[in-house]
Amino acid sequence: NDLPRFIDRNNCNEILFALPTAILVPPKVYNEAYKKYKKLQPEILIATEKITNPIWWAMEIKKNYLHPIFKDKVSVDSSKLKPAYSDAGLFYFFNQKKIAKYVSHKNAKKIFPYMINSNYTCDLNTMSDLEYLIYKYKLLKSKSP
């Protein structure tokens, strides 16, 4: 783990951890997120996106057939279901001393969701994901001054 070495070398516990999938995120987003982080002082700020499809209707495959994961929610109208949010897999701001006590950063008690524009999000697991990322990158570049 490089974090302890970074902290010792720079005498700083404040970390911006950006993942390779954050390639589309412009500097102004980091600046705005950091201001929120400093003002609100959560244990961690996570770049977050709203999940567009109700997770409550999610299914899993068992013996070649779909089965609802949340059986009690399948007949609930989507307008009555709570919205769900996900780590966008882009970046985190945190204080290493505060977060080190957790097995996972997602176990922290004070997680601030920094809502991110979907223009900046991407999943990168397949070649088609990469092609879509390149498309989004070119689109964003063409719109920038």
Identify the role of each PLM range.
Residues 7-16:
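Short acidic donor-binding loop at the edge of a beta-strand
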Residues 1, 59-63, 127-131:
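Short, surface-exposed amphipathic charged segments that create phosphate/polyanion-binding patches used
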Residues 114-115, 119-145:
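Hydrophobic helical membrane-anchoring modules
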Residues 1-8, 64-70:
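A polyampholytic, Gly/Pro-enriched intrinsically disordered region
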Residues 14, 23-115:
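Conserved core of the sugar-phosphate nucleotidyltransferase
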Residues 18-20:
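Active-site acidic Asp-centered loop
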Residues 1-5, 29-36, 132:
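Alpha-helical elements of Rossmann-like donor-binding domains used by nucleotide-donor carbohydrate transfer enzymes
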